[in-house]
Each structure stands twice: as structure tokens, then as C-alpha cells.
From Swiss-Prot:
Key words of the record: Cytoplasm, Cytoskeleton, Endosome
Origin organism lineage: Eukaryota, Metazoa, Chordata, Craniata, Vertebrata
Protein name stated in the entry: TBC domain-containing protein kinase-like protein
Ranges for domain Protein kinase: 1-273
Gene3D superfamilies the UniProt entry points to: putative rabgap domain of human tbc1 domain family member 14 like domains, Rhodanese-like domain, Transferase(Phosphotransferase) domain 1, Ypt/Rab-GAP domain of gyp1p, domain 3
Biological role: Component of the FERRY complex (Five-subunit Endosomal Rab5 and RNA/ribosome intermediary). The FERRY complex directly interacts with mRNAs and RAB5A, and functions as a RAB5A effector involved in the localization and the distribution of specific mRNAs most likely by mediating their endosomal transport. The complex recruits mRNAs and ribosomes to early endosomes through direct mRNA-interaction. Also involved in the modulation of mTOR signaling and expression of mTOR complex components. Involved in the control of actin-cytoskeleton organization.
Native source species: Mus musculus
Encoding gene per record: Tbck
Length: 893
């Protein structure tokens, strides 16, 4: 979007036509409200940017099908020129005509017709240039089908539009609709407006609507429309004095038969504009992020760098995009409905005044005044930015232009910076509503994303603090590493040819997050269908499983006007977090995933794990929808956004920690109930505090050794050429345990049956060495470096017999031989190291032996005794022998 500059923001409101509540559609579902349909169609209008068009910003839905549209606005319009009742100069008329045609031509390229062209919808900016307003009303209302008022103004409607009339459907049954207006209807409207400017007066003012319509239709019987109009309004002398090129424009615009009338594109190329057209440079839309074109191709720097700032005064807010300004306006307390009420655009009527005078037994009523609220009041109310500017008055200019390269520690910090640092410690819900904080975060992320992928590392760093909601869609794409010609790739996929999956997709979409106005709109359904189908077609080795629609929902919502980016994000997300989950036979993948999840429950909450296992409430009964949809099936979108903000920063094992965190929030209820009650509890999941869930899942993730969540069916490591780039940009906690380099100390795959038989997870020798802070000799490497002063995070319990232990053991480990470790009742036998084991309860306990079955049994006993964070060394003591890290106790003399 363009910067706000000298423009303002305006809002206008109208009602969509209401539908009966007792009528269903052909699919048996209730009819989609017309306001929802309009809201869905409106979204594409936000992407249409041109210097001759007022930028659409937002649409909000109120009660009783009310819609409020926010768009760029200018106070002056051609209506003001006509009020002066003076003919406009010929050169000005030519410039106005050409600029209007520029806007209309750009709209036509995007398949949009204005249809509501009139002097008060042709605005003038501070420099006197044209901006077309309300050009999307005809498009968003489905050519007027979804509202009870006509689109357009009788004096300016083309004859072919008037001839079709305004049909109304009865009982909401589709009838034969008139053909939608084409680009040529706008050319007629422009002709009438130019005629009015030339003569300095408005036409048809003395005629009522029916007479105007009749007069316009009779123009088809005359030879010269211009002369007839001039004679009718007593301005023939003025018309005769017009230069030939202006007369030619008027004649071409006011050609009665549309087949002979030029389109805006044809008229722009006409010889009459030969002197005007060189004054204007063709508009080239700037390349957006993730576009295939080179973003810096048209970048030119002036010789004097100060020239960049010559047009910038102290109004830094005006340099931000109109979308950002509106978002901040809302945060600063802006209320659209309140603004419209203050200007008396919205008037409340006492209910008693709406009662009929007579009411018969059959329900027929009489004496009710006509409700005129359903008609269009196209008054645009200017939204005051005073409250926002007052809120941001203490924000310095440097906040609008953050330095990304300089060392911030050497720069002086203002009070504003100190306040921001304090704000960063506040709860996320408060930060997201803090105007000043969001301004700084939006500007910072905007700068970083413009430098993507060069600034990928810094995007990761800032995303760990928080992600501003306005920048979430692009930030997620950056975190997922989306790059390349995503639009060309998406466009090349066949999304039209019928496939067997179509039927299931059609069934699932109307059930997917339909509480959301955007996703429940017909436009949302169509986009859902295309993105899902594109994914299915482009992944022939995978299949569509129910739940894929829920997985698609967050990406589609954030990138509603960019299906290619939604598809690219989804295609990058699934291999990372749900690798092979969508195979036709995915049982082995799901079973391994759920087994590892069971081990994670036992690792972090043994008491809960013991209880769930005793009552037979296994993850297969409740967790498959969690992980298959990455929680999008169980949480609403606003919770998913905060959850995924953190999920995307972690590796593929982070979902396990989210799952455990959810169970821990329900812990008391689960421990107090049996199998049937737990089933009922999960059939309608109780309210989950998502901020607490995120916080606890991060804590669980930090306590989990990386290799404890190893899965043989996880995404295989990328080739060395790619992985080196990924490793250099991704933080340690987002790296996978399977990432290279793979050594002899890494975890090995084991059969699923063996994995299921073990209650506690295995960790690799690599992780053990890392957590014990041991020094490795030879060619072995550890993934991280720890300081020598830090306390050990774990206790190694060696369960071999004492003779083997004396021959060589891990430094700092304790010996509890398996044969004498537990009593007949299953309690831990008292011994010299029992107290030490008890003191380490709560820290990581690694069970080491040389017989895998014994180590698994020992770990299971500890879990039964409610010892948390118990795990097994993969490969046993034999994995450690080649490292030279085993120590032998000094002989006692």
C-alpha cells in the first residue's frame, strides 16, 4: 500500500439485504448472509493500488447486516468545482478525463467496473490530481444483487444500464439476472461528468428520476447527443465554443450504442490525448515480497542523498502505509461506529416507533413506516487522526527509521526506548494493544522483511520476542524459509481438473473455522478449495486426510489475498512438522509419533502418565486430531496465531511439548476421573489458557534433551549444501536432532515394537556428553558448548553390577545394580546412593546399562515411583566406550 501522505481516511456505511432465517441452500445448510458474501469479495479490493484510486483499507460487519467500509479519502471532489458554477478550462478537462481513464483502465485490467461514477466520487488530492472513490461497490455487492439499492446515480447511468432495469429476486430464488455492466458504461458516466464540467452546471436537476430515465433512453433516437443535451439545458453557446478535441471526447464518451462506444483503454490511446498523455508516466506496481521479479530493479539513488528526505517533514506518521495508520488508529481507541453516530450517519430509532398500527391474526401488518435505513447514504465521514497523533507525540523520528546495522548499545537511549523495553516484559495480550509498542514493532519488522532473506537471522531473533499481528503472515513465511517464484509455481498447478478428492474437500470446507467471517464467505470457500487442491495435486505421493483443511486455515486467513503464499507456507510447514503424516498408509508414522508423545508425558509428568495408562486413556483416543492438524482443529484461530508464533521457532519436536502442556492444564481433572469421564472431557475440550500453554511448553522444551524426541519417520536431514545454510541461520533450539553431522554417538533407529515397550525416552550419547559437560577426545563433536561453572543438569544412574562399574564408568555417575535395586513390593531398595537419587528428583536422570531390557525396566520403575525426567542412554555403556570418557576409580590402599 502507498503511504498516507496528505490523504485522510474515510468511512461510509450501508446495509446488505437481509435473508429469511427459515430458508436453506441447496446443500441443506443455512444461507450465507449477504454481508458475509460482501465481506469476502471486498478483500481483493485491498490489493488494488494505483495513484488514481482511493485505497481500500478495511471492512467491518455490524448488527443487522450493517457494513462499514474504510478507504483513503480526500475532502475535495469534482462536486466542489461544479458548485462554483463556472466552466472548467479546456486543458483541465482534458487532464481530468485522462486521469479518470487511467484509473478506470487499471480497474478494468483487474476485472472491475466502477458503475458508480459521479462528480462526488471523483476526488481531488492536495496537488489537484484525480482519485476515484467507491469503485468497489459494484464488485463487492455482486453487481448490486446483495443490496436493496441500485449501484449508480440515475443522471450518470449509461442507457444500456437503465434499459435493463433493476430486477429483484423473489423468495430468494435465483432468477434471470441482467448482464453485468462492462467498462463502456463508465465511459458514458465520464462523458456526462465532462459535459457538466465544460458547461459549469449539473444536468437533469429540474427533472425527477422517472423523467431523467425517460430522457436518457430517448437519446438513442437523436443524431447528436451533445447538441440535444446542450439545447435541453440552455448551454448550446458554451458547447459551440469548445475546442474540437474536447468535443471529440464528449462525442466518443456519449455514444448511445455501447457497441460503438470506446473502452477506457481505447479512449486513452485516442489522438485527442496526444498532448496530455506525455505528461504522465505509466504506473508500475512495486514488486512485493516473495515476488519473482527483482525488487531492486527500478531502484535509483539520487546523487545527493539528502534529496531522499526533501519531501519529508516532521509528520513521520504520514510516511507509513495507510493500512498501518488505520491499524494504529484502531489501537489508539478508534471506533468506526462511534464516528458514524457522531456525524448522525447511524441513527438509532426507539423500538416502539417501529411497531405497526394494525396487526391481523395471520401476521399481516399495516401502518408501518418504510424503513429507509436499508437505502444507501453514501456520505463519507473523515476519520480524525488527532487521538492517534496525540498518542504518538512523544515518539521520536528515529523510531520511524530504525538502524539495522549499527551497534545499538553505543546509541543514546531516549525515554521512549526505555518505555519500550519495559513494555516488552508485559503480557503479550497487553503488548498487542499498546499503540506505541506496536508502532515500533511494525516498523522494525517491515524493515527486516524488506531485507529478507538477508536479514533472516534478525527476523528469527525478533520473532522470539513477539510478532506484531499486522506483520504475522509475511513473518511466518520468512520463518518457514519461503523463497523463490511462488506465484509462478502456484499458477502452474492445475486446480480445475476434477479429482477424486474434490468431494471430500467440498464436505470439509463448510465445517472448517466457519465462525470466522472471512473463512465462511463464498470467496473464502473458493480460496480454500484452490489451495487445498493445489497441495493435493502437487504432492502425488501424499493424500488428502480430513484435518488438512484446518491446517490450511491459518495460512489462508493471514494471506487471504495471496493464495500462492498461503500454499507456499503450507507446503513448507507440512514437511517440517508433519512429515509423511499424509501418506495413504500413515499408521506407522502416527503410531511412532504417539509413542514418543506417551514417552514425553512420562518424562515430564510421571504421575499423570501412570494414571492415564492405568485407566487405558492412551493418546490414540484424543491426540491424533491434535497433531494431524497441529492443534488447528481444537483451538480457534486467535489462539492458533499465538501458539504457532512460538511453534514456528521450534523444531519438529515442539508439538510434543505443547501436547504435554495442554494435559498439564487439565491435570487435576484428569487425575480425579476415570476413562469415561476423560473421554467426555476431551469430546468438548475445556477452555485452555493459551499464553500459559505457550509459556509452559517452552519450559518443557528446554528441559527435554533434543534426542529424546528422535523419530525415524521424521523429515530426513537436508543435503549438506542446504543444511549448512539452514544451520547458519536457525538458532540451536530450532535445529533437529537428525541434522548433520551424524556421528557414532547419535541416536539409532529401533523397531516400533521396542519403542512401544519402553516407558521412558532414549537419549543419544551425544546429548549425554553435552549435558554432563564432558570433554570429548578424538573426532567426536557435541552440538553445543557449555560453561564450566554451570551446575550439572542430570544424574547418570549406572545399573550394571559393581564389578563392571569399577572397571569403567561415566564421571559423576552413581551405581545402583539392577539385580538389587528394587524390593519385592517394587520400592527402591535402600542403599548408599538412594538419598542422592532422591535429591536429584526433578532433574534429568539417565539410566545406563549394557542390557537394553534391564535399563527400560529400571526406568519404568522410577516412573512408577513418580520420578520425572527419566530417560535411557541409547546403545548403553558401549556407546560411550570408544570416546575415552569412562573413568576408573583410584584403588584404595
Amino acid at each position: 500500500m502507498f503511504p498516507l501522505k496528505d490523504a485522510e481516511m474515510g468511512a461510509f456505511t450501508f446495509f446488505a439485504s437481509a435473508l429469511p432465517h427459515d430458508v436453506c441452500g441447496s446443500n441443506g445448510l443455512p444461507l450465507t448472509p449477504n454481508s458475509i458474501k460482501i465481506l469476502g469479495r471486498f478483500q481483493i479490493l485491498k490489493t488494488i493500488t494505483h495513484p488514481r484510486l482511493c485505497q481500500y483499507v478495511d471492512i467491518s460487519r455490524g448488527k443487522h447486516e450493517r457494513l462499514v467500509v474504510v478507504a483513503e479519502h480526500c475532502e475535495r471532489s469534482l462536486e466542489d468545482l461544479l458548485r462554483e458554477r463556472k466552466p472548467v478550462s479546456h486543458s483541465t478537462v482534458l487532464c481530468i478525463a485522462y486521469e479518470v481513464l487511467e484509473g478506470l483502465h487499471y480497474l478494468n485490467k483487474h476485472g472491475i467496473v466502477h458503475r458508480a461514477l459521479s462528480p462526488h466520487n471523483i476526488l481531488l488530492d492536495r496537488k489537484g490530481h484525480i482519485k476515484l472513490a467507491k469503485f468497489g461497490l459494484y464488485h463487492m455487492t455482486a453487481h448490486g444483487d446483495d443490496v436493496d439499492f441500485p449501484i449508480g446515480y440515475p443522471s450518470y447511468l449509461a442507457p444500456e444500464v437503465i434499459a435493463q432495469g433493476i430486477p429483484k429476486t423473489t423468495d430468494h430464488v435465483p432468477s434471470e439476472k441482467p448482464l453485468p455492466s462492462g467498462p463502456k458504461s463508465d465511459v458514458w458516466s465520464l462523458g456526462i461528468i465532462l459535459f457538466e464540467l465544460c458547461v459549469g452546471r449539473k444536468l437533469f436537476q429540474s427533472l425527477d428520476v422517472s423523467e431523467r430515465v425517460k430522457f436518457l433512453l430517448t437519446l438513442g433516437c437523436v443524431d447528436d447527443t451533445i447538441i440535444v443535451l446542450a439545447e435541453e439545458h440552455g448551454c448550446l453557446d458554451i458547447i459551440k465554443e469548445l475546442p474540437e478535441n474536447v468535443i471529440n471526447i464528449l462525442k466518443k464518451c456519449l455514444t448511445f450504442h455501447p457497441s460503438k462506444r470506446p473502452t477506457p483503454d481505447e479512449l486513452m490511446k485516442d489522438q485527442v490525448f496526444s498532448e496530455v498523455s506525455p505528461l504522465y508516466t505509466p504506473f508500475i506496481k512495486p514488486a512485493s515480497l516473495f515476488s519473482s521479479s527483482l525488487r531492486c530493479a527500478d531502484l535509483t539513488l539520487p546523487e545527493d542523498i539528502s534529496d531522499l528526505c526533501k519531501d519529508i517533514d516532521n509528520d513521520y506518521l504520514a510516511e507509513r502505509s495507510i493500512e498501518e495508520v488505520y491499524y494504529l488508529w484502531c489501537l489508539a481507541g478508534g471506533d468506526l461506529e462511534k464516528e458514524l453516530i457522531n456525524k448522525e450517519i447511524i441513527r438509532s430509532k426507539p423500538p416502539v416507533c417501529t411497531l405497526p398500527n394494525f396487526l391481523f391474526e395471520d401476521g399481516e401488518s399495516f401502518g408501518q413506516g418504510r424503513d429507509r435505513s436499508s437505502l444507501l447514504d453514501d456520505t463519507t465521514v473523515t476519520l480524525s487522526l488527532c487521538q492517534l497523533r496525540n498518542r504518538l507525540k512523544d515518539v521520536g523520528g528515529e523510531a520511524f527509521y530504525p538502524l539495522l546495522e549499527d551497534d545499538q548499545s553505543n546509541l543514546p537511549h531516549s525515554n521512549s526506548n526505555n518505555e519500550l523495553s519495559a513494555a516488552a516484559t508485559l503480557p503479550l495480550i497487553i503488548r498487542e494493544r499498546d499503540t506505541e509498542y506496536q508502532l515500533n514493532r511494525i516498523i522494525l519488522f517491515d524493515r527486516l522483511l524488506k531485507a529478507y532473506p538477508y536479514k533472516k537471522n534478525q527476523i528469527w531473533k525478533e520473532a522470539r520476542v513477539d510478532i506484531p499481528p499486522l506483520m504475522r503472515g509475511l513473518t511466518w513465511a520468512a520463518l518457514l524459509g519461503v523463497e523463490g517464484a511462488i506465484h509462478a509455481k502456484y499458477d502452474a498447478i492445475d486446480k480445475d481438473t476434477p479429482i477424486p478428492t474434490d468431494r471430500q474437500i467440498e464436505v470439509d470446507i463448510p465445517r472448517c473455522h466457519q465462525y470466522d467471517e472471512l473463512l465462511s464467505s463464498p470467496e473464502g470457500h473458493a480460496k480454500f478449495r484452490r489451495v487445498l487442491k493445489a497441495w493435493v495435486v502437487s504432492h502425488p505421493d501424499l493424500v488428502y486426510w480430513q484435518g488438512l483443511d484446518s491446517l490450511c486455515a491459518p495460512f489462508l486467513y493471514l494471506n487471504f489475498n495471496n493464495e500462492a503464499l498461503a500454499y507456499a507456507c503450507m507446503s513448507a510447514f507440512i514437511p517440517k512438522y508433519l512429515y509423511n503424516f499424509f501418506l495413504k498408509d500413515n499408521s506407522h508414522v502416527i503410531q511412532e509419533y504417539l509413542t514418543v508423545f506417551s514417552q514425553m508425558i512420562a518424562f515430564h509428568d510421571p504421575e499423570l502418565s501412570n494414571h492415564l495408562n492405568e485407566i487405558g486413556f492412551i493418546p490414540d483416543l484424543y491426540a491424533i486430531p491434535w497433531f494431524l492438524t497441529m492443534f488447528t482443529h481444537v483451538f480457534p484461530l486467535h489462539k492458533i496465531f499465538h501458539l504457532w508464533d512460538t511453534l514456528l521457532l521450534g523444531n519438529s519436536s515442539f508439538p510434543f511439548c505443547i501436547g504435554v502442556a495442554i494435559l498439564q492444564q487439565l491435570r487435576d481433572r484428569l487425575l480425579a476421573n476415570g476413562f469415561n469421564e476423560c473421554i467426555l472431557l476431551f469430546s468438548d475440550l475445556p477452555e485452555i489458557d493459551i499464553e500459559r500453554c505457550v509459556r509452559e511448553s517452552v519450559n518443557l522444551f528446554c528441559w527435554t534433551p533434543k534426542s529424546a524426541t528422535y523419530r525415524q519417520h521424521a523429515q530426513p536431514p537436508k543435503p549438506a549444501s542446504e543444511s549448512s545454510v539452514v544451520r547458519s541461520s536457525a538458532p540451536y533450539f530450532s535445529a533437529e536432532c537428525t541434522d548433520p553431522p551424524k556421528t557414532d554417538l547419535s541416536r539409532e533407529s529401533i523397531p516400533l515394537s521396542d519403542l512401544k515397550s519402553e516407558v521412558s525416552p532414549r537419549i543419544s550419547a551425544e546429548d549425554l556428553i553435552d549435558l554432563c559437560e564432558l570433554t570429548v577426545t578424538g573426532h567426536f563433536k557435541t552440538p553445543t558448548k557449555k560453561t564450566k561453572s554451570s551446575k550439572p543438569k542430570l544424574l547418570v544412574v549406572d545399573i550394571r553390577n559393581s564389578e563392571d562399574f569399577v572397571r569403567g564408568h561415566i564421571a559423576g555417575s552413581i551405581n545402583i545394580p539392577f539385580s538389587a535395586a528394587f524390593t519385592a513390593e517394587g520400592e527402591l531398595s535402600q542403599g548408599p546412593y538412594t538419598t542422592m537419587l532422591h535429591n536429584f528428583k526433578g532433574k534429568v536422570i539417565v539410566v545406563v546399562g549394557h542390557v537394553a531390557k534391564q535399563t527400560a525396566e529400571f526406568a519404568a520403575h522410577l516412573v512408577k515411583m513418580k520420578y520425572p525426567r527419566v530417560c535411557i542412554l541409547d546403545g548403553g555403556i558401549n556407546k560411550i566406550r570408544p570416546t575415552g570418557l569412562l573413568t576408573v576409580p583410584s584403588p584404595q590402599i
